[in-house]
Regions:
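A detector of single, family-specific signature residues
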Residues: 1-301
Length: 301
């Protein structure tokens, strides 16, 4: 660029500064760095960081289920979920069936009552201990130690994820985007969608956003062969694709118009995932229109 401005072979700091300034001023498409750009970058970093942390926590929870199946397999049928504060408190102190079987009933009752905020009482403690005494679980100190450490790591991740979500909430409250007026979209899901899309002015149409998320149908044609059942491309931002699909599930649950639209596609004989992809495309069109106009969501009557 510098050589195109002059035939003279001059290289000084003053000339360089003038050249850089001229190049920047000549770019008509260049936009100044705004608060919106800053918020988008911050949101993208935070939401992707949270995504990775949640994924890491999910793996640890699978490890807990595996270890409980070895140490006290009957426990899973006694509680709504293994991943509850009361169950984690129990397994932290008594990680195996043999530990629970030999525990004092008073101590067991106090632990369960305190960790469940009074939900579990003496009868539950007695039930757990009796199940532990007749359990087929193995007594393996190494696995018990692994279970305690895994639960500790999950608790640490819970605290980290909560801290990340608080930072996300602060930024979202400053932006106050229209997307949050759609029933079923929380600040976490809305933040990830906004962060991954970024500036909506970069996209000429909602279809461009769908292509960016890898949600457009693939095309294959060779001679007389034409694909009748086009598969999704699944390219682009996997974070955006994941966020849009999860958001669509919740919106279809909470918004009557989306719920009926999903039911209509299912009635046409479409597979659930195919019907959900149609609802996701409809959601993207609505989000695009809302963000471009700045208007809140108006439910269909």
């Amino acid at each position: 660029y510098r050589k195109s401005l002059s035939l003279r072979k001059t290289k000084t700091d003053k000339v360089d500064a003038h050249t850089i300034t001229s190049m920047i001023m000549s770019d008509v498409n260049l936009k100044s760095y705004s608060d919106t750009s800053y918020h988008n970058e911050e949101l993208k970093s935070l939401t992707r960081y949270r995504f990775d942390k949640v994924k890491e926590r999910a793996k640890l929870k699978s490890s807990v289920s595996r270890l409980v199946c070895i140490l006290f397999p009957e426990l899973e049928k006694l509680v709504p979920s293994l991943h509850m504060a009361s169950v984690y408190a129990l397994l932290t102190e008594f990680p195996s069936a043999s530990d629970i079987a030999s525990a004092h009933l008073t101590r067991l009752t106090h632990l369960l009552s305190q960790s469940s905020k009074g939900h579990y009482k003496k009868d539950t403690a007695f039930l757990f201990r009796e199940a532990a005494r007749s359990s087929i679980g193995s007594h393996m100190p190494a696995k018990s130690l692994e279970l305690k450490h895994t639960i500790k790591l999950i608790r640490e991740l819970d605290a980290e994820i909560n801290e990340i979500e608080n930072e996300i909430k602060i930024i979202i409250n400053e932006i106050n985007p229209p997307i949050l007026t759609i029933p079923g979209i929380s600040y976490r899901m809305g933040a990830m969608i906004l962060a991954e899309i970024g500036d909506f002015n970069r996209f000429d149409s909602p279809d461009k956003i769908l292509a960016y998320a890898g949600m457009s149908p693939s095309t294959y044609q060779s001679g007389q062969l034409d694909n009748c059942y086009a598969h999704m491309e699944k390219r682009g931002s996997r974070y955006l694709r994941d966020a849009l699909y999860n958001a669509t599930k919740y919106v279809c649950h909470w918004d009557p118009s989306f719920s009926s639209y999903l039911a209509q596609k299912r009635a046409e004989g479409k597979h659930y995932n195919v019907a959900l992809s149609h609802a996701a495309k409809k959601l993207v069109r609505i989000i695009y229109a809302m963000e471009k106009s700045g208007q809140s969501y108006i439910p269909a009557r």
